[in-house]
Amino acid sequence: MDLGVRVSGHETVSSPGQTELGSGFSNKQERSGFDGEDCWRSSKLSRTSTDGFSSSPASAKTLSFHQGIPLLRSTTINDPRKGQEHMLSFSSASGKSDVSPYLQYCRNSGYGLGGMMNTSNMHGNLLTGVKGPFSLTQWAELEQQALIYKYITANVPVPSSLLLSLKKSFFPYGSLPPNSFGWGSFHLGFSGGNMDPEPGRCRRTDGKKWRCSRDAVPDQKYCERHINRGRHRSRKPVEGQNGHNTNAAAAASAAAASTAAAVSKAAAGTSAVAMRGSDNNNSLAAAVGTQHHTNNQSTDSLANRVQNSRGASVFPATMNLQSKETHPKQSNNPFEFGLISSDSLLNPSHKQASYATSSKGFGSYLDFGNQAKHAGNHNNVDSWPEELKSDWTQLSMSIPMAPSSPVQDKLALSPLRLSREFDPAIHMGLGVNTEFLDPGKKTNNWIPISWGNNNSMGGPLGEVLNSTTNSPKFGSSPTGVLQKSTFGSLSNSSSASSTIIGDNNNKNGDGKDPLGPTTLMNTSATAPSL
Protein backbone atom coordinates (compact mmCIF):
# COMPACT_ATOMS: atom_id res chain seq x y z
CA MET A 1 0.00 0.00 0.00
CA ASP A 2 1.45 3.36 -0.93
CA LEU A 3 1.40 6.28 1.40
CA GLY A 4 1.94 9.81 0.26
CA VAL A 5 4.28 11.41 2.77
CA ARG A 6 6.44 14.42 1.99
CA VAL A 7 9.97 14.08 3.27
CA SER A 8 12.52 16.81 2.53
CA GLY A 9 15.76 15.75 0.83
CA HIS A 10 16.65 12.30 -0.41
CA GLU A 11 15.48 9.32 1.53
CA THR A 12 17.18 6.04 1.86
CA VAL A 13 15.20 3.02 2.89
CA SER A 14 17.21 0.89 5.24
CA SER A 15 15.19 -2.19 4.57
CA PRO A 16 16.56 -3.98 1.51
CA GLY A 17 13.26 -5.65 0.72
CA GLN A 18 11.45 -2.38 0.37
CA THR A 19 11.98 -0.13 -2.60
CA GLU A 20 9.57 2.53 -1.66
CA LEU A 21 8.61 4.30 1.50
CA GLY A 22 4.98 3.92 0.86
CA SER A 23 5.11 0.27 -0.05
CA GLY A 24 3.60 -0.69 3.28
CA PHE A 25 4.48 -1.79 6.76
CA SER A 26 4.03 -5.47 6.08
CA ASN A 27 7.29 -7.06 7.18
CA LYS A 28 8.32 -5.43 10.42
CA GLN A 29 5.31 -5.14 12.66
CA GLU A 30 6.65 -5.39 16.15
CA ARG A 31 3.66 -4.21 18.17
CA SER A 32 0.93 -6.67 18.80
CA GLY A 33 -2.61 -5.47 18.88
CA PHE A 34 -2.12 -2.91 16.11
CA ASP A 35 -2.39 -3.67 12.43
CA GLY A 36 -1.04 -0.61 10.73
CA GLU A 37 -1.55 -1.96 7.23
CA ASP A 38 -5.23 -2.43 7.75
CA CYS A 39 -5.55 0.99 9.21
CA TRP A 40 -3.68 2.58 6.34
CA ARG A 41 -5.65 0.60 3.81
CA SER A 42 -8.82 1.92 5.24
CA SER A 43 -7.59 5.45 4.92
CA LYS A 44 -6.71 5.14 1.16
CA LEU A 45 -4.79 8.35 0.88
CA SER A 46 -4.39 9.37 -2.75
CA ARG A 47 -1.07 9.55 -4.52
CA THR A 48 -0.46 12.95 -6.09
CA SER A 49 2.83 12.25 -7.85
CA THR A 50 4.21 9.49 -10.01
CA ASP A 51 7.17 8.85 -7.78
CA GLY A 52 4.91 7.97 -4.86
CA PHE A 53 5.24 11.23 -2.98
CA SER A 54 2.98 14.16 -2.77
CA SER A 55 4.26 17.49 -3.93
CA SER A 56 1.78 19.45 -1.94
CA PRO A 57 3.22 21.14 1.12
CA ALA A 58 0.00 20.55 2.98
CA SER A 59 0.44 16.83 2.67
CA ALA A 60 3.63 17.01 4.65
CA LYS A 61 1.60 16.75 7.76
CA THR A 62 2.17 13.39 9.25
CA LEU A 63 -0.47 10.96 10.39
CA SER A 64 -0.80 10.68 14.07
CA PHE A 65 -2.98 8.56 16.22
CA HIS A 66 -1.68 9.88 19.46
CA GLN A 67 0.96 12.44 19.95
CA GLY A 68 4.53 11.13 20.23
CA ILE A 69 3.70 7.50 19.39
CA PRO A 70 5.94 6.21 16.56
CA LEU A 71 5.09 3.40 14.20
CA LEU A 72 8.22 1.54 15.36
CA ARG A 73 9.58 1.37 11.84
CA SER A 74 13.23 2.24 11.44
CA THR A 75 13.77 4.57 8.48
CA THR A 76 16.88 6.52 7.51
CA ILE A 77 16.15 9.91 6.13
CA ASN A 78 18.80 12.32 4.93
CA ASP A 79 17.78 15.70 6.07
CA PRO A 80 19.75 18.38 4.27
CA ARG A 81 19.31 20.60 7.25
CA LYS A 82 20.55 18.10 9.81
CA GLY A 83 21.95 15.30 7.65
CA GLN A 84 21.26 12.55 10.11
CA GLU A 85 19.00 9.57 10.47
CA HIS A 86 15.91 9.86 12.56
CA MET A 87 12.85 7.83 13.39
CA LEU A 88 9.80 8.58 11.27
CA SER A 89 7.45 10.27 13.59
CA PHE A 90 3.80 10.65 12.52
CA SER A 91 3.22 13.61 14.73
CA SER A 92 1.35 16.65 13.67
CA ALA A 93 2.46 20.07 14.70
CA SER A 94 -1.04 21.45 14.46
CA GLY A 95 -2.54 18.55 16.39
CA LYS A 96 -5.07 18.09 13.59
CA SER A 97 -5.46 14.66 12.11
CA ASP A 98 -6.29 13.92 8.51
CA VAL A 99 -7.47 10.35 9.15
CA SER A 100 -11.05 9.35 9.57
CA PRO A 101 -12.56 9.16 13.03
CA TYR A 102 -12.85 5.41 12.69
CA LEU A 103 -9.06 5.09 12.45
CA GLN A 104 -8.62 6.88 15.72
CA TYR A 105 -11.29 4.70 17.33
CA CYS A 106 -9.60 1.68 15.81
CA ARG A 107 -6.40 2.72 17.51
CA ASN A 108 -8.08 3.28 20.83
CA SER A 109 -10.09 0.08 20.84
CA GLY A 110 -6.89 -1.97 20.48
CA TYR A 111 -7.84 -4.63 17.95
CA GLY A 112 -5.47 -7.52 17.69
CA LEU A 113 -3.89 -8.32 14.30
CA GLY A 114 -6.86 -8.07 12.10
CA GLY A 115 -9.49 -9.98 14.03
CA MET A 116 -13.02 -9.15 13.05
CA MET A 117 -11.78 -6.22 11.04
CA ASN A 118 -10.93 -8.55 8.17
CA THR A 119 -14.44 -9.86 7.74
CA SER A 120 -16.17 -8.68 4.64
CA ASN A 121 -19.42 -7.58 6.25
CA MET A 122 -17.78 -5.66 9.02
CA HIS A 123 -15.22 -4.15 6.71
CA GLY A 124 -17.88 -3.16 4.23
CA ASN A 125 -19.95 -1.52 6.90
CA LEU A 126 -16.94 0.35 8.17
CA LEU A 127 -15.99 1.60 4.70
CA THR A 128 -19.45 3.04 4.20
CA GLY A 129 -18.80 5.41 7.05
CA VAL A 130 -20.60 3.74 9.97
CA LYS A 131 -19.82 5.70 13.06
CA GLY A 132 -20.49 5.01 16.69
CA PRO A 133 -18.90 3.50 19.76
CA PHE A 134 -19.34 -0.18 18.87
CA SER A 135 -17.11 -3.01 19.98
CA LEU A 136 -16.66 -6.36 18.30
CA THR A 137 -19.24 -8.02 20.53
CA GLN A 138 -21.65 -5.22 19.88
CA TRP A 139 -21.21 -5.59 16.13
CA ALA A 140 -21.79 -9.33 16.40
CA GLU A 141 -24.91 -8.80 18.45
CA LEU A 142 -26.11 -6.14 16.06
CA GLU A 143 -25.76 -8.51 13.11
CA GLN A 144 -27.60 -11.21 15.05
CA GLN A 145 -30.35 -8.84 15.97
CA ALA A 146 -30.64 -7.73 12.36
CA LEU A 147 -30.99 -11.38 11.37
CA ILE A 148 -33.69 -11.89 13.97
CA TYR A 149 -35.45 -8.80 12.67
CA LYS A 150 -35.37 -10.25 9.16
CA TYR A 151 -37.01 -13.42 10.49
CA ILE A 152 -39.68 -11.35 12.19
CA THR A 153 -40.44 -9.21 9.14
CA ALA A 154 -40.62 -12.33 6.97
CA ASN A 155 -43.17 -13.87 9.39
CA VAL A 156 -40.88 -16.83 9.91
CA PRO A 157 -40.38 -18.38 13.36
CA VAL A 158 -37.07 -17.34 14.84
CA PRO A 159 -34.81 -20.34 15.52
CA SER A 160 -34.33 -21.07 19.21
CA SER A 161 -30.61 -21.53 18.71
CA LEU A 162 -30.37 -17.97 17.49
CA LEU A 163 -32.17 -16.68 20.55
CA LEU A 164 -30.22 -18.82 23.01
CA SER A 165 -26.90 -17.77 21.56
CA LEU A 166 -28.03 -14.19 21.78
CA LYS A 167 -28.96 -14.56 25.46
CA LYS A 168 -25.72 -16.32 26.30
CA SER A 169 -23.72 -13.57 24.65
CA PHE A 170 -25.10 -10.96 27.06
CA PHE A 171 -22.56 -10.54 29.81
CA PRO A 172 -21.50 -14.17 30.12
CA TYR A 173 -19.01 -13.27 32.83
CA GLY A 174 -20.58 -10.11 34.12
CA SER A 175 -17.45 -8.10 33.32
CA LEU A 176 -19.05 -5.21 31.47
CA PRO A 177 -21.83 -3.13 32.94
CA PRO A 178 -24.86 -2.41 30.76
CA ASN A 179 -24.30 1.32 30.65
CA SER A 180 -20.76 1.11 29.28
CA PHE A 181 -21.95 1.03 25.68
CA GLY A 182 -24.00 4.17 25.75
CA TRP A 183 -27.18 2.23 24.94
CA GLY A 184 -28.19 1.93 28.57
CA SER A 185 -30.03 -1.22 29.57
CA PHE A 186 -31.52 -1.79 26.14
CA HIS A 187 -30.81 -5.46 25.47
CA LEU A 188 -33.96 -6.88 23.86
CA GLY A 189 -35.76 -6.85 27.18
CA PHE A 190 -33.25 -9.12 28.92
CA SER A 191 -31.50 -8.22 32.13
CA GLY A 192 -28.20 -9.77 33.04
CA GLY A 193 -28.91 -10.13 36.76
CA ASN A 194 -32.24 -11.99 36.49
CA MET A 195 -31.38 -14.01 33.41
CA ASP A 196 -31.35 -17.78 33.77
CA PRO A 197 -28.50 -19.28 31.74
CA GLU A 198 -30.36 -22.61 31.61
CA PRO A 199 -34.07 -21.87 31.30
CA GLY A 200 -35.36 -25.44 31.32
CA ARG A 201 -33.42 -26.54 34.39
CA CYS A 202 -34.61 -26.62 37.97
CA ARG A 203 -33.47 -23.53 39.82
CA ARG A 204 -33.09 -25.17 43.23
CA THR A 205 -29.59 -24.42 44.48
CA ASP A 206 -27.69 -24.65 47.72
CA GLY A 207 -26.92 -20.95 47.57
CA LYS A 208 -23.42 -21.46 46.19
CA LYS A 209 -22.41 -23.48 43.14
CA TRP A 210 -24.63 -26.53 43.22
CA ARG A 211 -27.80 -26.56 41.15
CA CYS A 212 -30.39 -29.26 40.64
CA SER A 213 -29.80 -31.23 37.46
CA ARG A 214 -33.44 -32.15 36.85
CA ASP A 215 -35.65 -30.49 34.30
CA ALA A 216 -38.16 -28.02 35.63
CA VAL A 217 -41.89 -28.61 35.46
CA PRO A 218 -43.45 -26.73 32.52
CA ASP A 219 -44.30 -23.16 33.47
CA GLN A 220 -42.56 -23.61 36.81
CA LYS A 221 -39.15 -22.81 38.23
CA TYR A 222 -38.47 -26.11 39.95
CA CYS A 223 -38.66 -29.81 39.23
CA GLU A 224 -41.26 -32.17 40.65
CA ARG A 225 -39.05 -32.93 43.64
CA HIS A 226 -38.44 -29.34 44.66
CA ILE A 227 -41.71 -27.69 43.61
CA ASN A 228 -43.33 -28.36 47.02
CA ARG A 229 -40.23 -27.80 49.11
CA GLY A 230 -41.28 -24.39 50.37
CA ARG A 231 -44.66 -25.52 51.74
CA HIS A 232 -45.32 -26.55 55.29
CA ARG A 233 -44.79 -30.25 55.81
CA SER A 234 -47.82 -30.76 58.03
CA ARG A 235 -50.21 -29.56 55.36
CA LYS A 236 -52.34 -32.41 54.12
CA PRO A 237 -53.25 -32.90 50.47
CA VAL A 238 -56.46 -31.34 49.28
CA GLU A 239 -57.85 -34.71 48.15
CA GLY A 240 -57.40 -36.17 51.63
CA GLN A 241 -59.12 -33.23 53.23
CA ASN A 242 -62.08 -33.52 50.88
CA GLY A 243 -62.42 -37.22 51.64
CA HIS A 244 -62.29 -36.56 55.36
CA ASN A 245 -64.91 -33.85 55.08
CA THR A 246 -67.24 -36.10 53.10
CA ASN A 247 -66.88 -38.90 55.65
CA ALA A 248 -67.60 -36.51 58.49
CA ALA A 249 -70.62 -35.13 56.65
CA ALA A 250 -71.93 -38.65 56.02
CA ALA A 251 -71.51 -39.57 59.69
CA ALA A 252 -73.23 -36.36 60.77
CA SER A 253 -76.12 -36.97 58.40
CA ALA A 254 -76.50 -40.55 59.65
CA ALA A 255 -76.51 -39.35 63.25
CA ALA A 256 -79.07 -36.69 62.41
CA ALA A 257 -81.27 -39.27 60.69
CA SER A 258 -81.12 -41.63 63.68
CA THR A 259 -81.88 -38.77 66.05
CA ALA A 260 -84.83 -37.69 63.93
CA ALA A 261 -86.15 -41.26 63.90
CA ALA A 262 -85.85 -41.51 67.68
CA VAL A 263 -87.56 -38.18 68.15
CA SER A 264 -90.37 -39.20 65.82
CA LYS A 265 -90.87 -42.43 67.76
CA ALA A 266 -90.93 -40.49 71.01
CA ALA A 267 -93.39 -38.03 69.57
CA ALA A 268 -95.61 -40.88 68.42
CA GLY A 269 -95.57 -42.41 71.89
CA THR A 270 -96.30 -39.21 73.75
CA SER A 271 -99.56 -37.33 73.81
CA ALA A 272 -100.59 -35.21 70.85
CA VAL A 273 -101.59 -32.24 72.96
CA ALA A 274 -101.52 -29.00 71.01
CA MET A 275 -101.00 -26.06 73.29
CA ARG A 276 -102.39 -22.72 72.24
CA GLY A 277 -101.36 -19.30 73.56
CA SER A 278 -99.40 -18.47 76.66
CA ASP A 279 -102.26 -18.34 79.11
CA ASN A 280 -101.86 -19.78 82.60
CA ASN A 281 -104.47 -22.39 81.81
CA ASN A 282 -102.28 -23.74 79.04
CA SER A 283 -99.73 -24.81 81.64
CA LEU A 284 -102.06 -27.76 82.19
CA ALA A 285 -101.18 -29.10 78.78
CA ALA A 286 -97.49 -28.55 79.49
CA ALA A 287 -97.76 -30.49 82.74
CA VAL A 288 -99.86 -33.15 81.06
CA GLY A 289 -96.96 -33.62 78.61
CA THR A 290 -94.00 -35.77 79.45
CA GLN A 291 -92.10 -34.57 82.54
CA HIS A 292 -88.90 -36.06 83.85
CA HIS A 293 -87.64 -35.98 87.39
CA THR A 294 -84.08 -37.19 87.81
CA ASN A 295 -83.93 -37.16 91.60
CA ASN A 296 -85.89 -40.38 92.14
CA GLN A 297 -85.03 -43.30 89.88
CA SER A 298 -87.21 -45.79 91.68
CA THR A 299 -90.30 -44.42 90.00
CA ASP A 300 -89.49 -46.25 86.77
CA SER A 301 -89.61 -49.66 88.37
CA LEU A 302 -92.62 -48.60 90.41
CA ALA A 303 -94.54 -47.64 87.30
CA ASN A 304 -93.66 -50.94 85.68
CA ARG A 305 -94.95 -52.84 88.72
CA VAL A 306 -98.15 -50.83 88.66
CA GLN A 307 -98.71 -51.76 85.06
CA ASN A 308 -97.83 -55.46 85.37
CA SER A 309 -99.24 -56.24 88.85
CA ARG A 310 -102.69 -57.47 87.77
CA GLY A 311 -101.95 -58.82 84.32
CA ALA A 312 -104.30 -56.24 82.89
CA SER A 313 -102.72 -52.82 82.94
CA VAL A 314 -104.36 -50.14 85.00
CA PHE A 315 -103.08 -47.65 82.43
CA PRO A 316 -103.91 -48.20 78.77
CA ALA A 317 -101.44 -49.08 76.06
CA THR A 318 -101.69 -45.61 74.59
CA MET A 319 -100.16 -44.16 77.74
CA ASN A 320 -96.42 -43.73 77.57
CA LEU A 321 -95.02 -44.16 81.05
CA GLN A 322 -91.89 -42.12 80.53
CA SER A 323 -90.12 -40.66 77.54
CA LYS A 324 -86.39 -41.22 77.45
CA GLU A 325 -85.55 -38.76 74.75
CA THR A 326 -87.35 -35.57 75.64
CA HIS A 327 -86.84 -33.81 78.96
CA PRO A 328 -88.91 -30.63 79.02
CA LYS A 329 -88.22 -28.24 81.82
CA GLN A 330 -90.52 -28.28 84.77
CA SER A 331 -92.84 -25.32 84.88
CA ASN A 332 -93.07 -23.29 88.06
CA ASN A 333 -96.55 -21.96 87.35
CA PRO A 334 -98.63 -22.16 90.57
CA PHE A 335 -101.77 -22.86 88.50
CA GLU A 336 -100.35 -26.08 87.05
CA PHE A 337 -102.13 -29.35 86.93
CA GLY A 338 -101.47 -31.15 90.19
CA LEU A 339 -101.94 -28.54 92.90
CA ILE A 340 -103.39 -30.77 95.54
CA SER A 341 -104.22 -30.65 99.23
CA SER A 342 -102.04 -32.70 101.49
CA ASP A 343 -105.03 -33.97 103.45
CA SER A 344 -106.57 -35.60 100.44
CA LEU A 345 -103.15 -37.02 99.64
CA LEU A 346 -102.76 -38.69 102.99
CA ASN A 347 -106.39 -39.85 103.49
CA PRO A 348 -107.24 -42.52 100.90
CA SER A 349 -110.77 -43.04 102.25
CA HIS A 350 -114.03 -41.56 101.00
CA LYS A 351 -112.87 -41.96 97.42
CA GLN A 352 -110.56 -38.99 97.82
CA ALA A 353 -108.13 -39.23 94.95
CA SER A 354 -104.85 -37.43 95.20
CA TYR A 355 -105.75 -35.44 92.11
CA ALA A 356 -107.75 -32.97 94.17
CA THR A 357 -107.03 -29.61 92.67
CA SER A 358 -107.61 -25.99 93.44
CA SER A 359 -107.78 -24.30 90.05
CA LYS A 360 -111.16 -22.92 89.03
CA GLY A 361 -112.48 -24.91 86.08
CA PHE A 362 -110.09 -27.77 86.53
CA GLY A 363 -112.95 -30.20 86.17
CA SER A 364 -113.54 -29.00 82.65
CA TYR A 365 -110.09 -30.19 81.69
CA LEU A 366 -110.65 -33.71 82.94
CA ASP A 367 -114.38 -34.23 82.62
CA PHE A 368 -115.54 -35.17 79.15
CA GLY A 369 -119.02 -36.06 80.33
CA ASN A 370 -119.78 -32.61 81.70
CA GLN A 371 -118.36 -30.47 78.93
CA ALA A 372 -121.61 -28.61 78.53
CA LYS A 373 -121.41 -27.52 82.16
CA HIS A 374 -118.00 -25.93 81.67
CA ALA A 375 -118.25 -24.68 78.13
CA GLY A 376 -116.63 -21.39 79.05
CA ASN A 377 -113.36 -22.98 80.12
CA HIS A 378 -113.28 -25.71 77.52
CA ASN A 379 -112.29 -23.35 74.74
CA ASN A 380 -108.78 -23.10 76.21
CA VAL A 381 -108.00 -26.73 75.37
CA ASP A 382 -107.88 -28.20 71.90
CA SER A 383 -110.28 -30.94 70.96
CA TRP A 384 -109.12 -34.39 72.00
CA PRO A 385 -109.18 -37.37 69.63
CA GLU A 386 -112.18 -39.58 70.20
CA GLU A 387 -110.21 -42.80 69.82
CA LEU A 388 -108.04 -41.85 72.79
CA LYS A 389 -110.95 -41.22 75.16
CA SER A 390 -112.03 -44.85 75.23
CA ASP A 391 -108.62 -46.05 76.31
CA TRP A 392 -108.05 -43.63 79.11
CA THR A 393 -108.34 -44.89 82.65
CA GLN A 394 -111.32 -43.40 84.41
CA LEU A 395 -110.77 -42.32 87.96
CA SER A 396 -113.28 -41.50 90.63
CA MET A 397 -112.19 -38.11 91.90
CA SER A 398 -113.90 -35.92 94.43
CA ILE A 399 -113.32 -32.21 94.66
CA PRO A 400 -113.85 -31.56 98.37
CA MET A 401 -114.85 -27.92 97.93
CA ALA A 402 -117.45 -26.11 96.01
CA PRO A 403 -116.15 -23.97 93.14
CA SER A 404 -117.29 -20.87 94.99
CA SER A 405 -115.56 -21.75 98.23
CA PRO A 406 -113.40 -18.90 99.55
CA VAL A 407 -110.70 -21.30 100.71
CA GLN A 408 -110.19 -22.51 97.15
CA ASP A 409 -107.90 -19.59 96.41
CA LYS A 410 -105.73 -20.51 99.38
CA LEU A 411 -105.27 -24.00 98.04
CA ALA A 412 -103.77 -22.63 94.87
CA LEU A 413 -100.68 -21.70 96.82
CA SER A 414 -99.76 -25.32 97.46
CA PRO A 415 -96.46 -26.23 95.81
CA LEU A 416 -97.36 -29.90 95.75
CA ARG A 417 -97.57 -30.48 91.99
CA LEU A 418 -97.73 -33.56 89.87
CA SER A 419 -94.12 -33.28 88.85
CA ARG A 420 -92.97 -36.82 89.50
CA GLU A 421 -94.14 -39.56 87.20
CA PHE A 422 -96.29 -42.09 89.01
CA ASP A 423 -95.19 -41.08 92.47
CA PRO A 424 -96.33 -43.60 95.11
CA ALA A 425 -98.08 -40.92 97.09
CA ILE A 426 -100.56 -40.50 94.29
CA HIS A 427 -101.30 -44.17 93.85
CA MET A 428 -102.67 -44.58 97.29
CA GLY A 429 -105.62 -42.50 96.14
CA LEU A 430 -105.69 -43.96 92.65
CA GLY A 431 -108.38 -46.51 92.03
CA VAL A 432 -110.04 -48.18 89.07
CA ASN A 433 -113.69 -47.37 88.58
CA THR A 434 -116.43 -49.99 88.74
CA GLU A 435 -116.62 -49.95 84.96
CA PHE A 436 -113.49 -52.11 84.78
CA LEU A 437 -113.54 -54.29 87.91
CA ASP A 438 -116.09 -56.00 90.10
CA PRO A 439 -117.63 -53.74 92.74
CA GLY A 440 -116.96 -56.42 95.29
CA LYS A 441 -113.27 -55.94 94.83
CA LYS A 442 -113.53 -52.21 95.25
CA THR A 443 -111.91 -52.38 98.65
CA ASN A 444 -108.77 -53.83 97.20
CA ASN A 445 -108.58 -51.00 94.69
CA TRP A 446 -107.61 -48.55 97.38
CA ILE A 447 -104.72 -50.55 98.70
CA PRO A 448 -101.85 -48.08 98.64
CA ILE A 449 -98.78 -48.82 96.62
CA SER A 450 -95.61 -49.08 98.64
CA TRP A 451 -92.57 -46.87 98.00
CA GLY A 452 -90.11 -48.24 95.41
CA ASN A 453 -89.85 -51.63 97.11
CA ASN A 454 -92.27 -53.74 99.13
CA ASN A 455 -90.61 -53.17 102.48
CA SER A 456 -92.86 -51.80 105.19
CA MET A 457 -92.17 -48.31 106.43
CA GLY A 458 -92.40 -47.11 109.98
CA GLY A 459 -93.66 -43.88 111.34
CA PRO A 460 -96.86 -42.01 110.63
CA LEU A 461 -96.40 -42.05 106.89
CA GLY A 462 -95.75 -45.80 106.87
CA GLU A 463 -98.85 -46.31 109.00
CA VAL A 464 -100.95 -44.68 106.34
CA LEU A 465 -99.24 -46.36 103.42
CA ASN A 466 -99.35 -49.85 104.88
CA SER A 467 -103.06 -49.76 105.79
CA THR A 468 -105.07 -52.42 103.91
CA THR A 469 -108.55 -51.25 104.77
CA ASN A 470 -110.40 -48.02 104.28
CA SER A 471 -109.70 -45.60 107.04
CA PRO A 472 -112.60 -43.84 108.79
CA LYS A 473 -114.47 -41.35 106.76
CA PHE A 474 -113.05 -38.37 108.55
CA GLY A 475 -110.18 -40.00 110.37
CA SER A 476 -107.47 -37.65 111.45
CA SER A 477 -103.98 -38.19 110.17
CA PRO A 478 -101.08 -38.06 112.61
CA THR A 479 -98.86 -36.66 109.93
CA GLY A 480 -99.06 -33.04 110.93
CA VAL A 481 -95.49 -32.52 109.93
CA LEU A 482 -96.55 -32.57 106.29
CA GLN A 483 -99.15 -29.90 106.94
CA LYS A 484 -96.68 -27.09 107.57
CA SER A 485 -97.16 -23.64 106.19
CA THR A 486 -94.60 -24.34 103.47
CA PHE A 487 -97.16 -26.53 101.74
CA GLY A 488 -99.73 -23.79 101.80
CA SER A 489 -102.49 -26.18 102.94
CA LEU A 490 -105.82 -25.21 104.41
CA SER A 491 -104.65 -25.48 108.01
CA ASN A 492 -101.76 -26.81 110.09
CA SER A 493 -103.56 -30.00 111.15
CA SER A 494 -104.95 -32.79 109.09
CA SER A 495 -108.01 -33.05 111.31
CA ALA A 496 -108.94 -29.48 110.58
CA SER A 497 -108.44 -30.07 106.91
CA SER A 498 -110.63 -33.14 107.06
CA THR A 499 -113.32 -31.24 108.89
CA ILE A 500 -113.37 -28.47 106.35
CA ILE A 501 -113.47 -30.97 103.55
CA GLY A 502 -116.32 -32.81 105.19
CA ASP A 503 -118.28 -29.63 105.67
CA ASN A 504 -117.83 -28.64 102.10
CA ASN A 505 -118.97 -32.05 100.94
CA ASN A 506 -122.08 -31.75 103.06
CA LYS A 507 -122.85 -28.41 101.50
CA ASN A 508 -123.27 -30.08 98.14
CA GLY A 509 -126.47 -31.69 99.37
CA ASP A 510 -126.43 -34.97 97.55
CA GLY A 511 -122.96 -35.98 98.70
CA LYS A 512 -121.99 -36.96 95.23
CA ASP A 513 -118.92 -35.99 93.36
CA PRO A 514 -119.65 -32.57 91.86
CA LEU A 515 -117.50 -33.35 88.85
CA GLY A 516 -118.54 -36.92 88.37
CA PRO A 517 -116.25 -39.53 86.87
CA THR A 518 -113.36 -37.86 85.17
CA THR A 519 -110.91 -39.13 82.67
CA LEU A 520 -107.17 -38.87 82.94
CA MET A 521 -106.20 -37.00 79.81
CA ASN A 522 -102.46 -37.55 79.65
CA THR A 523 -100.50 -40.42 78.27
CA SER A 524 -97.76 -39.79 80.79
CA ALA A 525 -99.19 -38.69 84.12
CA THR A 526 -97.01 -36.84 86.55
CA ALA A 527 -96.73 -37.25 90.28
CA PRO A 528 -96.24 -34.72 93.08
CA SER A 529 -92.79 -34.02 94.37
CA LEU A 530 -92.59 -34.22 98.15
Swiss-Prot record:
Alphabetized InterPro entries for the sequence: Gln-Leu-Gln_QLQ, GRF, WRC_dom
Misc: Overexpression mutant display larger leaves and cotyledons, as well as a delayed bolting of the inflorescence stem when compared to wild-type plants.
Coiled coil segments of this chain: none
Domain WRC: 196-240
Biased composition (Polar residues): 11-27, 519-530
Gene: GRF1
QLQ domain boundaries: 133-168
Role noted for this protein: Transcription activator that plays a role in the regulation of cell expansion in leaf and cotyledons tissues. Component of a network formed by miR396, the GRFs and their interacting factors (GIFs) acting in the regulation of meristem function, at least partially through the control of cell proliferation. microRNA396-GRF1/GRF3 regulatory module acts as a developmental regulator in the reprogramming of root cells during cyst nematode infection, leading to the formation of the syncytium.
Tissue specificity annotation: Strongly expressed in actively growing and developing tissues, such as roots, upper stems, and shoot tips containing the shoot apical meristem (SAM) and flower buds. Also expressed in mature flowers, but weakly expressed in mature stems and leaves.
GO terms for biological process, alphabetical: DNA-templated transcription; glucosinolate metabolic process; regulation of DNA-templated transcription; regulation of nematode larval development; response to cold; response to gibberellin; response to nematode; root development
Biased composition (Basic and acidic residues): 28-41
Composition bias, Low complexity: 485-508
Any GO CC annotation of this UniProt entry: nucleus
Notes on the domains: The QLQ domain and WRC domain may be involved in protein-protein interaction and DNA-binding, respectively.
Cellular location(s): Nucleus
Family: Belongs to the GRF family.
Subunit structure: Interacts with GIF1 and GIF2.
Keyword entries, A-Z: Activator, Nucleus, Transcription, Transcription regulation
Official protein name in the record: Growth-regulating factor 1
Region (Disordered): 1-41, 223-250, 485-530
Locus of motif Bipartite nuclear localization signal: 201-211, 229-236
GO molecular function: ATP binding; transcription cis-regulatory region binding
Pfam family, one: WRC
Induction of synthesis: microRNA 396 (miR396a or miR396b) negatively regulates growth-regulating factors (GRF1-4 and GRF7-9). Up-regulated in response to cyst nematode infection.
